C-alpha cells in the first residue's frame, strides 16, 4: 500500500486541488443562508435565549444558583450579583477559609456530594484524590508527548479520550462508576495540562524539558505551580490566589455552554471520557473560555498606545476609540465588561479583584493594577453610554483573571486549560445529576424552512461549475 508522507495536505503546494477547494468553498458560501427575518417570524429562541437575552428554561439543578436581581412588588430590580454552590454563598465559602490555606478540594467535595465535608471527610477525600493524582511514565511518553502543539486544550481532549482505553469499565455509566471516573479525571487533569505545555515548549520551541511529579500533601493549586515552574518554588500568597481562582471558576449553573454540553452529551448515554472531552471542546471556544486572553491582549494594546496610564482623559479617549472600532481589534468591545446574567456586580470578579490587589502589591505591579481599576470604572460608564443601555454593565471574572495568571507566571497557553481544571468539578457534578435524574435525551426542535424540490437525473442537471482535473497534479506529486 502506497501511503502519503503527510497527515494533512498543504493546499498551497497543490494548485489544482486548491482550485477545486475554492470552487467547493464558494458553493458552500452561496448556500445555507437563512433569512434572519424567519427567526423572528417563527419566534426562534436563538442561543436558547428569549428576546431580552435571558436563557430559556431547559432543566433544573441543585448544584449552583446565579442571581442578579431582586423581586420588589413583582418587578425585577438589578442587584449585586450572588453565586451559590449547593446553597452556600461563594462569599461565605471564600471567607470561611480564613483559618485554612486552601479551599478548592473542599469546593470539589461540596459540588460532587452536595454537602460541606467534616474535617475527617475532607482528609479522606484528599487522600483519594492523591491516589488518583498520577500518570504513568508510559502514558506521558506515548500520549502526552506525542503530537504536541500550542493548543493545550486540544492536547487535553486527546489525552482524556485516550484514558478511556486504560479504564477497565469505561462504558459503565452507573453513578458509582462515573463518580470514580470523575474524581480520577479531576485529579489527573492538572498533570495533563502542565505536561502538555512542557511538551509543547520542548518539541515546538526547543526549550528544556522537565517533568515533575506532584507532591503528596500539597493542594492542587500548589502542585500546579510546583509542576509548572523550573525551580518548583512559589509563595504562600501565589498558591492561595490560584486556589481562590480555581474555586471561583469551578461552577456557574447548568446553562453555560460547556456545562450544557455536559448535560446534552450525558443524556445520550455516552461515556464519561467523551462527555469531558466534549465540554473541553466547548470551553475552548473564544466565546466561552477564551475571554481572559482577549482582555490581556486588549490591555497590552492600551499600554502601548496610552502614554500616561494615570491620565483619566487619555485612557477614556482610547477606550472610546476601542468602542468606535477605531482601535485594538476593531470589534467595538471592551473585553471583560458585561455579563449575560450579572448587572451591578459579578461576585467572582469582586472576590478575585481583592486577591489581585494583594498579589500586585507583592509583585510590585500596583501601577498595572491601577490601570485595570481605571478601565473598569470608565468602561462600565462608556459601554452604557455608547450602547444606550438601561441595564447596568459590570466587569466580569475574566477582567482580572488573565492579569492574575500573568502575575503568577502562568503562560497564555495555559489560561483556558486552567479554566478547564477549575470547571471539571462542576461538569462532573452536572453529569452525575443528569444520570441520577435520568430523563429523556435532550433534543430541541429545528424547523425546516427550505423548499422541497423535484429530483433531477444527472444528464439534466445544470453544469453550474467546472472542476479542474486533478489527475495531472496528483501524478506530479506522487499522491
Label for each model-derived stretch:
Residues 4-479:
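Non-transmembrane, aqueous-exposed alpha-helical and coiled segments at domain scale
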Amino acid at each position: 500500500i502506497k501511503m502519503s508522507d503527510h497527515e494533512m495536505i498543504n493546499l498551497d503546494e497543490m494548485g489544482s486541488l486548491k482550485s477545486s477547494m475554492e470552487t467547493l468553498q464558494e458553493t458552500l458560501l452561496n448556500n445555507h443562508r437563512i433569512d434572519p427575518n424567519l427567526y423572528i417570524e417563527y419566534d426562534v429562541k436563538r442561543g436558547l435565549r428569549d428576546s431580552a437575552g435571558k436563557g430559556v428554561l431547559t432543566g433544573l439543578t441543585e448544584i449552583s444558583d446565579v442571581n442578579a436581581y431582586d423581586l420588589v412588588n413583582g418587578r425585577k430590580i438589578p442587584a449585586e450579583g450572588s453565586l451559590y454552590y449547593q446553597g452556600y454563598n461563594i462569599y461565605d465559602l471564600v471567607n470561611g477559609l480564613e483559618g485554612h490555606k486552601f479551599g478548592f478540594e473542599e469546593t470539589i467535595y461540596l459540588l460532587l456530594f452536595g454537602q460541606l465535608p467534616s474535617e475527617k471527610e475532607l482528609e479522606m477525600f484528599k487522600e483519594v484524590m492523591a491516589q488518583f493524582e498520577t500518570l504513568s511514565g508510559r502514558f506521558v511518553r506515548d500520549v502526552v508527548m506525542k503530537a504536541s502543539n500550542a493548543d493545550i486544550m486540544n492536547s487535553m481532549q486527546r489525552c482524556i479520550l485516550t484514558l478511556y482505553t486504560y479504564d477497565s469499565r469505561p462504558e459503565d455509566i452507573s453513578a458509582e462508576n462515573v463518580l470514580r471516573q470523575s474524581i480520577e479525571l479531576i485529579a489527573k487533569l492538572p498533570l495533563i495540562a502542565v505536561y502538555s505545555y512542557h511538551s509543547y515548549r520542548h518539541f515546538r520551541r526547543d526549550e528544556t524539558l522537565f517533568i515533575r511529579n506532584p507532591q503528596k500533601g500539597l493542594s492542587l493549586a500548589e502542585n500546579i505551580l510546583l509542576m509548572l515552574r523550573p525551580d518548583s518554588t512559589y509563595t504562600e500568597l501565589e498558591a492561595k490566589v490560584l486556589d481562590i481562582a480555581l474555586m471561583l471558576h469551578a461552577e456557574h449553573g447548568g446553562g453555560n455552554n460547556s456545562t450544557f454540553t455536559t448535560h446534552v452529551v450525558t443524556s445520550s448515554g455516552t461515556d464519561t471520557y467523551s462527555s469531558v472531552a466534549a465540554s473541553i471542546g466547548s470551553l475552548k471556544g473564544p466565546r466561552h473560555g477564551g475571554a481572559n486572553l482577549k482582555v490581556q491582549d486588549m490591555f497590552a494594546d492600551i499600554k502601548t498606545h496610552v502614554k500616561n496610564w494615570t491620565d483619566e482623559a487619555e485612557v477614556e479617549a482610547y477606550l472610546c476609540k476601542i468602542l468606535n472600532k477605531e482601535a485594538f481589534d476593531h470589534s467595538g468591545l471592551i473585553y471583560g465588561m458585561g455579563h449575560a446574567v450579572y448587572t451591578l456586580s459579578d461576585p467572582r470578579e469582586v472576590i478575585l479583584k481583592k486577591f489581585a490587589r494583594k498579589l500586585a502589591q507583592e509583585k510590585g505591579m500596583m501601577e498595572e493594577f491601577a490601570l485595570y481599576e481605571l478601565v473598569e470604572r470608565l468602561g462600565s460608564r462608556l459601554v452604557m453610554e455608547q450602547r444606550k443601555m438601561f441595564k447596568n454593565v459590570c466587569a466580569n471574572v475574566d477582567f482580572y483573571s488573565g492579569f492574575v495568571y500573568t502575575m503568577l507566571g502562568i503562560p497564555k497557553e495555559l489560561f483556558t486549560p486552567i479554566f478547564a481544571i477549575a470547571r471539571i468539578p462542576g461538569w462532573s457534578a452536572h453529569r452525575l445529576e443528569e444520570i441520577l435524574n435520568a430523563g429523556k435525551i435532550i433534543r430541541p426542535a429545528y424547523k425546516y424552512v427550505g423548499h422541497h424540490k423535484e429530483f433531477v437525473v444527472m444528464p439534466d442537471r445544470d453544469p453550474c461549475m467546472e472542476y479542474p482535473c486533478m489527475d495531472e497534479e496528483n501524478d506530479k506529486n506522487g499522491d
